[in-house]
Structure formats: C-alpha cells, structure tokens
Amino acid sequence: MWKLLFIGILFTSICHINFSEGLFKCKELGQSCRRTVFDRCCGNATCQLQGLKGKCVSCLNIGHLCWRNEQCCSQRCHRLRCRDKKVPTKIINVIQSNFSTIILKAN
C-alpha cells in the first residue's frame, strides 16, 4: 500500500516539475508532434501523423486519420478519415427515392 502511495506522489511530483519547466508545452504550427498529451499541438492546430511522427498543421487533408470534423480541412471526418465534403450521388438518390415513397404512402 505504501509503495503505491509513494509511486503516486513521485509521479505527481515529476509531472509537476516537467509541466513547470515546459517539457510538455504544446507545439506551434510546423513543429514536430506525436498526437499525445505530452507532445500535442497548441490551440486549434492538429497533428498530421506519418507513422509515429508528425507535424502541427491547421487542418488535415483528405485521407488523413482524424477523430473530429473540426480537424479536417473539409470539415468531414467519417470512419476515422478526413473525407471529401461532397455527399456521394448514390446516397442522394437513395434518400430522394425513400422520400418520394414516404410522400406517396402519406397521400
């Protein structure tokens, strides 16, 4: 029990020292990053990874790994990838045909 408490206090102290010395400071545009809490980009910038290394950019191009729409230049993150903002024509046709069917059934 005491060992666990000691490890917790030691870890907290090390993190406090590292944060105060700036070892975990956020990175500016163009600087290297790794998309971790210890090596992150500042503000609205996001880390564009290639393998395990990356650099801070204002937004991610189509095809890059993403978590949120705001990270993508196209503002569309779908299935963990930045996608084109355009909705495929096939989906539009399906929606239109389903909508027409609903209207006909309602009348």
Curated annotation (Swiss-Prot):
It is found in: Secreted. Residues 1-22 form the signal peptide. Its main location: secreted. Keywords: Disulfide bond, Glycoprotein, Knottin, Secreted, Signal. Pfam families: UPF0506 (PF11703). GO terms for cellular component: extracellular region. Disulfide bonds join 59-73, 66-77, 72-82. InterPro entries: UPF0506. Glycans are attached at residues 18, 44, 98. It comes from the Eukaryota. The keyword Iron does not apply. The presence of a 'disulfide through disulfide knot' structurally defines this protein as a knottin. This is Uncharacterized protein SJCHGC06055. It comes from Schistosoma japonicum.
